[in-house]
Swiss-Prot record:
Record-annotated SIS domain positions: 57-220
EC number: 4.2.1.126
Misc: A lyase-type mechanism (elimination/hydration) is suggested for the cleavage of the lactyl ether bond of MurNAc 6-phosphate, with the formation of an alpha,beta-unsaturated aldehyde intermediate with (E)-stereochemistry, followed by the syn addition of water to give product.
Pathway annotation from the record: Amino-sugar metabolism; 1,6-anhydro-N-acetylmuramate degradation; Amino-sugar metabolism; N-acetylmuramate degradation; Cell wall biogenesis; peptidoglycan recycling
PROSITE patterns: GCKR, SIS
CDD domains, A to Z: SIS_Etherase (cd05007)
Tagged with keyword Lyase: yes
Name the record gives this protein: N-acetylmuramic acid 6-phosphate etherase
Pfam hit, one: GKRP_SIS_N
Length: 300
């Protein structure tokens, strides 16, 4: 079946770059940069829809659910990138935020032919994760019409999971296939059809907001400090110390002493210093308040 892509914004020609092959290198880059500046504004226009998705993901996390990204090509890789950053940044289990890409692991590094056109493949991928109604499935595709993503959203709807779509065309099948549609319209690409450019940047900004927003809402940020960060390397060990110093105002030595007393758990160390509790008391208090430092501090 022939697919008419000409009506898609993401496939149309951009008059601003029509002669880009004749420009100097600096002029060429200036055109790209000027077009990139439109991306943040396109994302700003859909903030209310992003907020709906953040609240849905936060609710899912609080009720044993997961966040599952689905995409093909660049969109799938962006989902995997965002998912992979959550454990080291927020101390989450690897299975809490998952990225699926059409074609599996091979497709992360190189294209897998016809994988994105297979709806059944998406259903099988979700079945392998034992998808439940508590989960949130986020379909990502610049065009808004990728069969793999549509198949995943359809199966997720059947199971009763919350569905979200992220696309860069204002009218597309994915908008109708999800409960929450996030559609940052960034306009035609500098290189016609190269949706890894503005569309990919918009998708990355939205994904940043989804996970960051949900983690903040889940108590994993205190002030603007990532208080669930795990000490998996030398840089993060030092970051833990800096976080405790910033959160409490104590010196680095006192912060390090508190961290050592609680197996390097930032939240516990912060609560110990600010409340005068010992490590076990602080851990218990945090558990009583689902890991929210502010709530634990306010419980006198």
């Amino acid at each position: 079946m022939k697919i008419d892509l000409s009506r898609l914004v993401t496939e149309s020609r951009n008059p601003a770059s029509a002669e880009i092959d004749t420009l100097s290198t600096v002029e060429m880059l200036r055109v790209i940069n000027q077009e990139d500046q439109k991306v943040a504004l396109a994302v700003e226009a859909v903030l209310p829809h992003i907020a709906q998705a953040v609240d849905a993901i936060t609710h899912a996390f609080a009720h044993g659910g997961r966040l599952i990204y689905m995409g093909a090509g660049t969109s799938g890789r962006l989902g995997i990138l965002d998912a992979s950053e959550c454990p080291p940044t927020y101390g989450t289990p690897a299975e809490l935020v998952v990225g699926l890409i059409a074609g599996g692991h091979t497709a992360i590094l190189k294209a897998v032919e016809n994988a994105e056109d297979n709806r059944e493949l998406a259903q099988n991928d979700l079945k392998s994760l034992n998808l439940t109604a508590n989960d949130v499935v986020v379909g990502i595709a610049a065009s808004g019409r990728t069969p793999y993503v549509l198949g995943g959203l359809e199966y997720a709807t059947l199971i009763g999971a919350t569905t979200v779509s992220i696309a860069c065309n204002p009218v597309c099948p994915m908008a109708d296939a999800a409960q929450i549609a996030i559609l940052p319209v960034v306009g035609p690409e500098v290189v016609t059809g190269s949706s890894r450019m503005k569309a990919g940047t918009a998708q990355k900004l939205v994904l940043n907001m989804l996970t960051s927003g949900a983690m903040i809402r889940s108590g994993k940020v205190f002030g603007n400090l990532m208080v669930d960060v795990e000490a998996t390397n030398a840089k993060l060990i030092q970051r833990q110390t800096n976080i405790v110093v910033e959160a409490t105002g104590v010196c680095a030595e006192e912060a390090e002493e508190a961290l050592k007393a609680c197996d390097r758990h930032c939240k516990t160390a912060i609560l110990m210093i600010l409340s005068g509790l010992d490590a076990e008391q602080a851990k218990t208090k945090l558990q009583q308040h689902n890991g929210f430092i502010r709530a634990a501090l306010n419980d006198k």
